[in-house]
């Protein structure tokens, strides 16, 4: 048995419309949307009465997917502390490679993203930053600045 691929990542959000706008600003497109409920989703989540509204987004290259989920029932539960700091245990961030870091950062900031530190350069390879995005998620943006991008 081996993993075939990473199918998608899920981000639970309070404001689904704002989250879709945030990630759409980075070029992601809506692949699907729906309301989910029933015995199967209760069993998968280990909770009763689960009702969610989801939007599935796809990256421009077609290889990555992000599921934005808004729980309608049971109620959302805030992380403590909220938002979680970068050194909190668990899933830390999602990183996207972008063309034009400045433009990508401007686009997400216009949609509520907050730059967490500074834009920094890692050697001669990447310019990158962390942005606090929808639901307090850490969204990393990285621009490949290598002259020879075959590495």
Task: Kindly label every feature range from the protein language model.
Residues 6, 16, 101:
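Hydrophobic pocket-lining residues within nucleotide cofactor-binding pockets
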Residues 12-63, 110, 129, 148:
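Core segments of cupin and vicinal oxygen chelate
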Residues 10-11, 96:
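Residues that cap or flank secondary-structure elements
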Residues 6-8, 89-93:
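Short, solvent-exposed beta-strand edge segments and adjacent coil->beta transition regions
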Residues 2, 33-35, 53-56, 64-69, ...:
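Vicinal oxygen chelate
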